[in-house]
Amino acid sequence: MIFEGSISVKAVMLANKRPIEKIVIDKKKHDKDTAFIIAKAHELGIHVEKADREKIDALCSGTSHGGVILYGGDRRNDALDQLIKSKFLCLLEGIEDPFNFGYCLRSLLAAGCEGVIVGTRNWLDSASTVTKSSGGASEYLPIYVADDLANAIL
């Protein structure tokens, strides 16, 4: 799956919760964020490819990527036994829209939440949208996906 934008790319790299195949950067970008992403990618052994903006646009669903994209795999599920030790844990239920889910995660992280339990829903198809709408919070915040929410909280 493709993660778009500097904030999402940095969050995926720094959280280290999913495999990363490569990063593609607009060859005309030369700002601080881009320099950080390139340096961190080299440190982590991630391949960085420079490309024309048009090529990057063609790979994405829109043009809000800012010239930076990351190819990543599925996120590892956080362990429930570690999450339940948290002082501030939240159970989110009934959220279907990936943008709203991302906004909730961003607000929870800002409020000091240390973990989130959610029911099964295929968020993997929307991971890029969730990461972007959460401002990267979805990558940093421990999340446990429960098959049965009632059993998860007992």
What label would you give each PLM region?
Residues M1-D81:
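N-terminal positively charged helical leader segments and presequences
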Residues D81-L154:
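RNA substrate-binding interface of SAM-dependent RNA methyltransferases
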